[in-house]
Amino acid sequence: MAKNIQAIRGMNDYLPGETAIWQRIEGTLKNVLGSYGYSEIRLPIVEQTPLFKRAIGEVTDVVEKEMYTFEDRNGDSLTLRPEGTAGCVRAGIEHGLLYNQEQRLWYIGPMFRHERPQKGRYRQFHQLGAEVFGLQGPDIDAELIMLTARWWRALGISEHVSLELNSIGSLEARANYRDALVAFLEQHQETLDEDCKRRMYTNPLRVLDSKNPDVQALLNDAPVLGDYLDDDSREHFTGLCKLLDAAGIAYTVNQRLVRGLDYYNRTVFEWVTNSLGSQGTVCAGGRYDGLVEQLGGRATPAVGFAMGLERLVLLVQAVNPEFIASPVVDIYLVAAGAQTQSAAMTLAERLRDEMPGVKLMTNHGGGNFKKQFARADKWGARIALVLGESEVADGTVVVKDLRSGEQTAVAQDSVAAHLRTLLG
């Protein structure tokens, strides 16, 4: 017998019961994006490797350790996208969407990173991202955060996420801070683990992300990035905080929040949760005013965020299961008798025309009443329609509420109105 071929570790199948949950959550996210004027852009999952090296930074963990990179038959180096912003910027430059224009874009799809699979973090994972180009004030940063806060309210998880903010300033301000941080770390190398010692000279701001408790204790005495901010960045951040205060959005300023990608400047933020065990990031983003020019376009201010959908789905399932308790099928049509199948299918098509969005399944494969009602239960139907030969003859159908057990015969011409009342 041939050996079964299984999915690659860290790359998961999502089965019908799971995809229904994803679709409900994604539909909510997309509706909110539309209400803020965002348009969808669809991007390739494979890009030229230099795109990510230039955008993300060659000495980041993503580029050094996590990218899926390969040569194609022409010898070109290609990479499965590890994130969405770089590809979105590349597309904007290539198609002339950015210079002297305002764009509000969103995308959704799989990303790929070769890291250790764990709950909510996989090698193929899904992100929804939003990017704004052409606006540089703190007001658009605030609106993006307000948009995400509206998501949490719509999903019923507002009480289980919290917002952390920081400003990492301009490129020059970060360079000055980097020098001060390296000088401090050099004086305390005995406390650093090997990973932090390596990062100290390649990307010292990443030391601030260390989970090592000894390093975290040491960093309590380290220089603070906020002390090195340029005046424009400080003014920008103050403006953002005032707008969030006015909107009633609570936040914590986290001076160690720097993000893992090199293209960020000024505003960075994360929505985090403690409701999935250890603290985890649900959504994160910030401003990246230099990236468009860095990738070959004209200088264009930009800000955006990305959200991991696997972690969001887990969070909604954990804290608001009622949101996703939606049946696969609203109505199950039971056809009793050999001569009724054609009439049943005709009635089902008419109801789909008259009730757009209703989830109606017609029984196929025969079976007695008991078997057909068992199938209706399996699919989670709320209502069964029973069509026998006598109902076909007199133009009626029996409508049975599978929760209360009540049933009544209704004329086929008026059954749609009756069903709308039952389904609410």
UniProtKB/Swiss-Prot annotation:
Top-level lineage group: Bacteria
> CDD domains of this UniProt entry?
HisRS-like_core (cd00773), HisRS_anticodon (cd00859)
Give the UniProt keywords, A-Z.
Aminoacyl-tRNA synthetase, ATP-binding, Cytoplasm, Ligase, Nucleotide-binding, Protein biosynthesis
Predominant place of localization: cytoplasm
- Looking at the keywords, is ATP-binding present? yes
The molecular function GO annotations come to: ATP binding; histidine-tRNA ligase activity
Reactions catalysed: tRNA(His) + L-histidine + ATP = L-histidyl-tRNA(His) + AMP + diphosphate + H(+)
Q: Record's GO cellular component, any one?
A: cytoplasm
Q: Where in the cell is it found?
A: Cytoplasm
Give any Pfam family that matches.
Answer: HGTP_anticodon
Q: Name one GO biological process term.
A: histidyl-tRNA aminoacylation
UniProt xrefs under PROSITE patterns:
AA_TRNA_LIGASE_II (PS50862)
State the top-level EC class.
ligase
EC code(s) of this entry: 6.1.1.21
- PANTHER family, per this entry? HISTIDINE--TRNA LIGASE, MITOCHONDRIAL-RELATED, HISTIDYL-TRNA SYNTHETASE
Q: Which family does it belong to?
A: Belongs to the class-II aminoacyl-tRNA synthetase family.
Its quaternary organisation is:
Homodimer.
Which NCBIfam families does UniProt cross-reference here? Answer: hisS
Q: Which HAMAP family match?
A: His_tRNA_synth (MF_00127)
Provide the protein name. Answer: Histidine--tRNA ligase
Source organism (scientific name): Salmonella paratyphi A (strain ATCC 9150 / SARB42)
| Lineage of the organism | Bacteria, Pseudomonadati, Pseudomonadota, Gammaproteobacteria, Enterobacterales
